[in-house]
């Protein structure tokens, strides 16, 4: 709606994950490198954790785009599944044909093992990426551990990347999942963007959208955006999108503190408020 007004070819602050807009902060780059390292070195498991909206899914999709034809990839986003559903989904993602009537756990594992052995013989690497892994049941997590038992004498046949919110770490330390937890040797916990990175992030997205044209963000606006969003990319997108819409309706091309405050009021302070103490701090910034 406002893109043409600001000389942009598209909305730079969409909430949908878009690899073209990937902003690699130092931490995001480290997380991506951890996944690549785990795959190349055949570590078996990689765990990437981080808060909601921090960019985990975008990094996941970017990883897939970086992998070449020597890597066979299965990607799972729906994690409200049973252990049998998991196996069926993995097999489907790899494009393995299953004979009707043979949909049992044993058959699924046998078929998958045959595929992985052929894949290994062809010099290829099989990767299973599971996003939103914090939603997996204990039974499914145990089944994932069992998949890592598929191996040759020298290496694991499948490399598994678990991506999830911080509570996944709390789940993995439970006694029932001790064996799985001990197998995960490559881990990275994503943190929010710093204040300078928030500014770079916004400028990066405007550049990708073929901007900024006449659009300007003041230093005060950048500072307030960081304060309200706490460096979480999804919140930054939501706040900037609303700020640009307000600027468009007011026929102005500068995003300043006033515009940012109006955007926060429109979205609602509760969207940005994580705790009572932080909420008081944010409310103070909003009313001054």
Show the residue positions of the predicted features.
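A short, basic N-terminal segment
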Residues: 1-41, 281-288
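Conserved NTP-binding/hydrolysis module of P-loop NTPases
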Residues: 11-13, 70-72, 84-100
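Walker A/P-loop nucleotide-binding motif
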Residues: 41-63, 79
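Short regulatory helix/loop adjacent to the ATP-binding pocket of P-loop NTPases
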Residues: 62-66, 168-183, 192
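Conserved AAA+ ATPase "SRH/arginine-finger" region at the nucleotide-binding site
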Residues: 76-80, 171-172, 185-198
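Mid-core helix/loop region of P-loop NTP-binding domains shared across ATPases and GTPases
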Residues: 82-85, 97-143, 152-156, 194-198, ...
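Conserved AAA+ ATPase "sensor/coupling" helix adjacent to the nucleotide-binding pocket
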Residues: 92-95, 166-167, 175, 193-212
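C-terminal alpha-helical "lid" subdomain
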Residues: 209-288
């Amino acid at each position: 709606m406002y893109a043409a007004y600001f000389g942009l070819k598209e909305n730079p602050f969409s909430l949908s994950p878009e690899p073209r807009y990937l902003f690699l902060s130092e931490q995001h780059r480290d997380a991506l490198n951890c996944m690549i390292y785990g795959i190349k070195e055949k570590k078996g498991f990689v765990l990437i954790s981080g808060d909601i909206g921090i960019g985990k899914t975008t990094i996941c999709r970017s990883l897939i785009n970086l992998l070449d034809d020597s890597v066979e990839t299965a990607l799972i986003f729906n994690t409200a599944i049973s252990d049998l559903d998991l196996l069926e989904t993995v097999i489907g993602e790899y494009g393995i044909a299953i004979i009707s009537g043979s949909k049992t756990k044993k058959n699924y594992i046998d078929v998958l093992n045959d595929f992985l052995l052929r894949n290994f013989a062809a010099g290829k690497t099989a990767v299973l990426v599971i996003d939103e892994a914090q939603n997996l049941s204990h039974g499914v997590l145990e089944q994932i551990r069992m998949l890592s038992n598929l191996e040759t004498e020298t290496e694991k046949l499948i490399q598994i990347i678990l991506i999830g919110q911080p509570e996944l770490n709390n789940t993995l330390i439970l006694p029932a999942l001790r064996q799985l937890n001990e197998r995960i040797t490559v881990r990275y916990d994503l943190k929010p963007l710093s204040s300078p990175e928030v500014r770079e992030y916004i400028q990066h997205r405007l550049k990708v959208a073929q901007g900024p044209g006449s659009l300007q963000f003041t230093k005060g606006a950048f500072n307030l955006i960081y304060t309200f969003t706490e460096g979480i990319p999804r919140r930054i997108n939501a706040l900037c999108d609303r700020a640009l819409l307000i600027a468009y309706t007011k026929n102005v091309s500068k995003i300043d503190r006033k515009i940012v405050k109006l955007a926060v009021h429109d979205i609602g302070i509760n969207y940005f408020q994580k705790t009572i103490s932080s909420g008081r701090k944010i409310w103070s910034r909003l009313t001054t």
